[in-house]
Amino acid sequence: SLCNAFPTLFDAIDESETMELDGVSRHVYWEVVDHCYLCDVCYMTKCPYVPPHEWNVDFPHLMLRAKAVKHSQGKTRTRDRILTSTDLVGTLAGIPVVSSVVNAVNRNKAGRRVLEELLEVHPDAHLPEYHSDTLRRRVDVTRNQDAEAAPEAGPTRGKVALFATCYGNYNEPDLGEDLIAVFEHNDIPVRLADTRRCCGMPKLELGDLPAVAKAKDVNIPQLAALVDRGWDIVAPVPSCVLMFKQELPLMFPDDPDVIKVRDAMFDPFEYLMARHKDGLLKTEFKESLGKV
C-alpha cells in the first residue's frame, strides 16, 4: 500500500554490509527520494513516529526537502521539467489539430517508442487523452457570476467556484461538466474560477519551490477574491485540493489569503456530504445505485 521508496530503502539496508543505514550507498538515497511522490499515505496511516511522537518524523516532507535541494543544484532532468509543466503542455496539446496528433501518437506503438526514447515514458504507461474542447471552452466563464447562494450547511456557504485543474480542463472535461450538473441538481450555483494556472503540485513534487511560489502568486489572489464575494472553492482533483488545503499553508503560513483559500477549499464529496448532513442533498435517484 506504500510507494516504492520503502522497499528500495529497506532492501538496500538488508543488502548492505552492516545491515544498517550507514552501510547504504548515498546514490541509493536519491533513488528513495525519486520514488516518493508525496502521497502522504505513510505519514497518515503507517508511520508510528509522527507527531505527537518525540521523533516528529514527516517522511514525505523530508523527501520534499531533498527534492528541493536536488532541483536547486540544477539536477532536474529536462523530461521532468516538461512533464510537470501541465498547464503549458495542456495548452499546446489542446490546440485542435495538435490534440489529434498527440492522442494518435500516444495510442501508437511506434509513437510510444519515440516517447520512451525522448522522454523515458514507459511504452505501457497509461497516458490521458487531450481535448481541444476543454472545460473552459465548454462552460461559459461568465455564468452565474451574480448568482444567489443556496442555504448554508455546515462550513459550506451554498455557491461554488470550480477550480477546473489542468487534468479537469484538458484531459477530462466531462468530469467538470458532470460535477457542475450534480451541484446544480442540488440547487447550488456553480461558476468557473477565473484562474487557469496549475495549482503547483507537479512542480512541488519536483522540488521546484520557486515555480510553486509563482503559481501561488497567480492563483491565490484570484481565489481569495472569490472567497471574499461569498464563493466556496471546489476542485475535482484530490491532489489539487491537497495543494491548497495543506501544502501551500505549510509553505506560506503567514499569508492571510493562503489561509483564507484553505478554509474555503473543498473536495467535491466533502462538500456534498456536508450538505447531506443538513438534509440539503437530493437523494431521490430515478434508478437504484445498486450495491456499492
What positions do the PLM features span?
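Short cysteine clusters
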Residues: 1-3, 36-47, 166, 199, ...
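Non-heme iron-sulfur electron-transfer modules
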Residues: 2-35, 49-79
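Short alpha-helix boundary/capping elements
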Residues: 11, 41, 90-91
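Processing junctions and N-termini across compartments
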Residues: 30-36, 41, 193
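Short, charged/polar micro-motifs that form catalytic or ligand-binding hotspots
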Residues: 32, 37, 52, 166-170, ...
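Residue-level signal for short amphipathic helical patches enriched in basic/charged
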Residues: 42, 54, 174
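General structural signal for alpha-helix termini and helix-helix connectors
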Residues: 45-53, 246, 250
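Iron-sulfur cluster-binding electron-transfer modules in prokaryotic oxidoreductases
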Residues: 57-292
